[in-house]
Amino acid sequence: MAEIDMTKPQPCTKFRDADTVEWIAKLMEETNEAIQEAENYEMICKNAAAGTGDVLDAKDRLAEELTDVITVCVSWLDALGYDEAKRGELNRRVNEKNEKRGYF
């Protein structure tokens, strides 16, 4: 078995057999956690000097929750049969579409 690159999103197989409603629930759960951390981050930024420990901690928590959302999406794609190569192709297509739209 190949070594897992822990610096890239890896699909979690625990929910591989989940039905659509369960996937949606998991995605909503993780998205709600990201929303809560985003609100917390905004509040802390408004009330603290930039670069303080509180701001940096809140930023890290938000980043981790956003990464959890990415991981759920990668896991769901994996469960749908999109391995890393197929997910890479999807990313390329979406990036090309976004480039044409002038998003970057």
Tell what function each PLM region has.
Residues 1-104:
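Flexible "arm" and connector segments at domain edges
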